[in-house]
């Protein structure tokens, strides 16, 4: 098992995990535009066996299996034993298991299946620096990748979160909860967060950007990189001439 299962591509600063919450999304052609996929078992209510097997065959990137608890923004209200019963049937079809800090006792079982672990914690508040550092260390103690989502209350909190992310010595996915400071989601990737989570049809967390929106942001914020989605389009990161040319064309078209 490798701890860099979600290692970021150095050619693009923002990489995208599409969070899938329905069979419809598992079968969507849009999944091919994501760098990695998250299967939200706590939100999916239909049978997914066939769809997940098909997705595993067709999708080449990492796949994450998640059962998010209701205490951390998900729909799972059961205990530790029930969590493993939900995970076990599908663990062979994915590369990574997301384990919340409350379920860290399952880490040895995940390791026995030779899967990487995203050790996660989601809080609707902004911890102080000491709390954040202690949380990072605890998550790292059982996970290959640390994942933290918190809720900044001020712009200063956002700046502090960027600094903590940049200074983290471990592989980390840092995110924010809520809509007020949702712009921090792509920015955190510029400061060392491996990935940002997006949706295809339905948000799995308030404040998420859609996959298409994040593709645009990834293009604009990764200097010198042209996402395949933009092939054939005139705009390149750092070059605004295409915008001006297109705007002039529109103005002429609208003249009466």
Swiss-Prot record:
Keywords: Amino-acid biosynthesis, Aromatic amino acid biosynthesis, Lyase, Schiff base. One of its GO terms (biological process) is 3,4-dihydroxybenzoate biosynthetic process. The active site is at 122 (proton donor/acceptor), 147 (schiff-base intermediate with substrate). 3-dehydroquinate binds at residues 19, 38-40, 68, 185, 204, 208. CDD domains: DHQase_I. Pathway: Metabolic intermediate biosynthesis; chorismate biosynthesis; chorismate from D-erythrose 4-phosphate and phosphoenolpyruvate: step 3/7. The keyword Repeat does not apply. It catalyses: 3-dehydroquinate = 3-dehydroshikimate + H2O. GO terms for molecular function: 3-dehydroquinate dehydratase activity. Belongs to the type-I 3-dehydroquinase family. Involved in the third step of the chorismate pathway, which leads to the biosynthesis of aromatic amino acids. Catalyzes the cis-dehydration of 3-dehydroquinate (DHQ) and introduces the first double bond of the aromatic ring to yield 3-dehydroshikimate. Homodimer. This is 3-dehydroquinate dehydratase. It comes from Methanospirillum hungatei JF-1 (strain ATCC 27890 / DSM 864 / NBRC 100397 / JF-1).
């Amino acid at each position: 098992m490798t701890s860099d299962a979600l290692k970021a591509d150095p050619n693009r600063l923002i990489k995208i995990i599409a969070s899938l919450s329905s069979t419809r999304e598992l079968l969507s052609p849009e999944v091919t535009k994501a760098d990695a996929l998250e299967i939200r078992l706590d939100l999916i209510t239909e049978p997914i066996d066939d769809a997940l097997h098909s997705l595993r065959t067709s999708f080449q990137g990492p796949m994450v299996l998640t059962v998010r608890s209701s205490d951390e923004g998900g729909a799972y209200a059961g205990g530790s034993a029930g969590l493993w019963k939900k995970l076990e049937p599908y663990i062979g079809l994915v590369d990574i298991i997301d384990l919340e800090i409350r379920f860290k006792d399952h880490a040895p079982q995940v390791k026995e299946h030779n899967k990487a672990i995203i050790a996660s914690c989601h809080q609707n508040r902004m911890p102080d620096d000491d709390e954040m550092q202690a949380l990072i260390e605890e998550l790292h103690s059982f996970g290959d990748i640390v994942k933290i989502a918190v809720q900044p209350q001020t712009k200063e909190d956002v700046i502090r979160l960027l600094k903590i992310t940049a200074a983290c010595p471990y592989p980390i996915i840092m995110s924010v909860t809520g809509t007020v400071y949702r712009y921090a989601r792509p920015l955190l990737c510029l400061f060392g967060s491996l990935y940002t989570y997006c949706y295809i049809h339905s948000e799995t967390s308030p404040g998420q950007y859609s996959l298409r929106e994040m593709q645009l942001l990834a293009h604009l914020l990764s200097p010198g990189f042209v996402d395949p989605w933009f092939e054939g389009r005139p705009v390149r990161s750092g070059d605004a001439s295409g915008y001006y040319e297109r705007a002039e064309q529109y103005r002429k078209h609208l003249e009466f």
